[in-house]
Amino acid sequence: MIMKKILSWFLYITCILTLVACGKSAAPITLPQADEITSIDITIEENTVSHSDKTWISEVIADISSSEPTKKESIQDFPQVESYIKIDFRLETGTSTIFAYEDRGKCYLEQPYQGIYKIDRKLFERLKEIE
């Protein structure tokens, strides 16, 4: 009888741990290739700065590519925070937009309907620089 209880608890805990470990994993951020981007426009409130320097674009794309997926979902066109940075990747074929923001002391990128990604503060501060 005691062995049955121990075995039942073991199976129960194993099932729970398996379900938790196999939760939905977020996909990495989807970005255009650096050589396809003609410029990156960064908008903070009403101020927009356009960056067309290929070196700057490549560095920013590399930094953004290293962002870590979170389990948070993006279900809106815009982040649900008061203040955010809009990042428009201008391509010859159109525009791709992501957003950067700070929430509870952590910095994130949000790609509408794709995912939310954690970034380091250094990248966030770089994006905030309006020259």
Where do the PLM segments sit?
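Function-determining sites in protein domains
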Residues: 2, 22-131
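Sec-dependent bacterial lipoprotein signal peptides
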Residues: 1-24
